[in-house]
């Protein structure tokens, strides 16, 4: 009896371990899926910023949205600083997902740094910065371009501000960098795109009519979409499929033109880009400026004291 109970307990432990292992695999798989979206650009474009200055994410996210960037005006070499990307988020809006259901908007961003600047390692971050970047997983755009950092998609509700920890280069070590003024370019999106890199449209688009004519019939499909039957002026019947999740703007008997939208626009997201300037400051120049300012201040102070002393002597001479 005891032997049977021991076997059963061992079997239960093995089953429990297998369940935990399976759960871990699923979590890792989902994590890989959630981080796979930036790979669209990474696989298609060697550099995400075109020669015109346009960031390639705009090729898939057609709607424009405002984004904002914050960074210090000056940084010292070999120091860690924050670059904050702000993505305005509307909590009352839902996006259409790939399966036609509605869900929260996700966000993503790419930061294009000057050559030599790169993602700061965790051992260089202070506690405050570690807390801000907790649960954020940044990736280099490619092995060659470690000055370009991508993140996303991540939940928009919790990430309206994304803090990028950046390590400034030291020109004394990296001879390709200099004490100059540089530009940081940022692109960020919220919600799904309208196109895939292949040029194929996603379901995040309004549906145009395939023909001119009269709406003969609207049939709901079992999957939740619609079949719209259009009768042309030549008495030809054309059937058009509207996928699940889209809202029709037409009704039976209505006349429409070819190319006229028969659904509302489901897109509630978009893409925006911005830039900011930053100076890599020379510490020697900064120290020299401080000493110069102090010397000027001391000189002015001595001048004032000397002037007061002179006025005092003049006053004494007049009394005699």
UniProtKB/Swiss-Prot annotation:
Q: Indicate whether Repressor appears among the record's keywords.
A: no
Membrane topology, as annotated, equals: Single-pass membrane protein
Which UniProt key words apply to this protein?
Chloroplast, Electron transport, Heme, Iron, Membrane, Metal-binding, Photosynthesis, Plastid, Signal, Thylakoid, Transmembrane, Transmembrane helix, Transport
Give the UniProt entry's GO cellular component terms.
chloroplast thylakoid membrane
Q: Where is the signal peptide?
A: 1-36
Q: Which PROSITE patterns match?
A: CYTF (PS51010)
**Where is this protein found?**
Plastid, Chloroplast thylakoid membrane
Cofactor(s) this protein requires: heme
Q: GO biological process annotations for this chain's record? A: photosynthesis
The keyword Iron appears for this protein = yes
Q: Which residues cross the membrane?
A: 286-305
Record-level Gene Ontology MF annotations: electron transfer activity; heme binding; iron ion binding
Q: How is the cofactor bound?
A: Binds 1 heme group covalently.
**SUPFAM superfamilies this protein is in?**
Cytochrome f subunit of the cytochrome b6f complex, transmembrane anchor, Cytochrome f, large domain, Rudiment single hybrid motif
Binding annotation for heme: 37, 57, 60-61
InterPro entries per the UniProt record, alphabetical: Cyt-f_TM, Cyt_f, Cyt_f_lg_dom, Cyt_f_lg_dom_sf, Rudment_hybrid_motif
Q: What does this protein do?
A: Component of the cytochrome b6-f complex, which mediates electron transfer between photosystem II (PSII) and photosystem I (PSI), cyclic electron flow around PSI, and state transitions.
- Extract the HAMAP family matched here: Cytb6_f_cytF (MF_00610)
Its family remark reads: Belongs to the cytochrome f family.
Quaternary data? The 4 large subunits of the cytochrome b6-f complex are cytochrome b6, subunit IV (17 kDa polypeptide, petD), cytochrome f and the Rieske protein, while the 4 small subunits are PetG, PetL, PetM and PetN. The complex functions as a dimer.
Q: What is this protein called?
A: Cytochrome f
Origin organism is Cyanidium caldarium (Red alga)
> Which taxonomic lineage does the organism of this UniProt entry have?
Eukaryota, Rhodophyta, Bangiophyceae, Cyanidiales, Cyanidiaceae
């Amino acid at each position: 009896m005891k032997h049977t109970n021991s076997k059963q307990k061992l079997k239960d432990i093995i089953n429990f371990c297998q369940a935990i292992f399976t759960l871990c695999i699923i979590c890792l798989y989902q994590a890989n899926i959630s981080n796979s979206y930036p790979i669209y650009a990474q696989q298609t474009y060697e550099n995400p910023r075109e020669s015109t200055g346009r960031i390639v994410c705009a090729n898939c996210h057609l709607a424009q949205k405002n984004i904002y960037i914050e960074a210090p005006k000056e940084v010292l070499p070999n120091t860690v600083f924050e670059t904050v990307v702000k993505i305005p988020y509307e909590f009352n809006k839902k996006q259409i997902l790939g399966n036609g259901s509605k869900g929260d908007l996700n966000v993503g961003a790419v930061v294009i740094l000057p050559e030599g600047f790169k993602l700061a390692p965790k051992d260089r971050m202070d506690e405050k910065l570690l807390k801000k970047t907790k649960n954020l997983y940044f990736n280099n755009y490619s092995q060659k371009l470690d000055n370009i950092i991508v993140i996303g998609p991540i939940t928009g509700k919790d990430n309206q501000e994304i803090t990028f920890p950046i390590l400034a280069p030291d020109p004394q070590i990296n001879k390709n960098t200099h004490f100059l003024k540089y530009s940081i370019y940022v692109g960020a999106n919220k919600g799904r795109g309208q196109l895939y890199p292949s040029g194929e449209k996603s379901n995040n688009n309004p549906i145009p009519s395939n023909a001119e004519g009269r709406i003969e019939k609207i049939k709901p499909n079992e999957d939740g979409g619609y079949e719209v039957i259009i009768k042309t002026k030549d008495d030809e019947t054309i059937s058009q499929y509207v996928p699940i999740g889209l809202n029709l703007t037409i009704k039976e008997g209505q006349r429409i033109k070819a190319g006229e939208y028969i659904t509302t626009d489901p897109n509630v997201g978009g893409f925006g880009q911005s830039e900011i300037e930053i100076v890599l400051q020379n510490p020697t120049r900064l120290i020299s400026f401080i000493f110069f300012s102090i010397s000027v201040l001391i000189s002015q102070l001595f001048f004032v004291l000397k002037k007061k002393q002179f006025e005092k002597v003049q006053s004494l001479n007049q009394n005699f």
